[in-house]
Amino acid sequence: MNRQDLLELMTTLDDAWNAGPGSSLWETFRKRHTEDVAVYWPGGAPPTRGRRNHDLEAVEFFKTFPDNHLINRPYKILFADGNHTCSVAEFRGTMKGPMKLGDQVIPPTGKSLRVEFCTVATWNDQGAITEERLFYDQVGLMKQIGLG
């Protein structure tokens, strides 16, 4: 894949994210991840493994933050090097649904969040992510939604 192809793949992946589950673009979000993708979240927890599991956690995220939006047109930063992309964008949303944290369910707070969100993705030659590393201020996010 050339640099421009990777930048377009990343941008349209985030377009699909912004459209959300149930939209005609959601299949793009799913197919941009390999069947055995590893998704690393902030906080050091073991990665989410597999497209299906990542899809399930994404759908749950939309239940908690149904109006979430990643500002990717334009990104704050977007570049490609080798088979990697790196994007930095503003991420916004409102906690309108319950949040599942382990065995706990936290009721919605109705509070909004705004954080910088960074994705470092490793792509295969077929245009799908094999490894995705996500970075954002977890403590700041929790404080903004009234949980910190």
For the regions a language model picked out, list residue spans one by one:
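C-terminal and inter-domain tail/linker signature
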Residues: 1-148
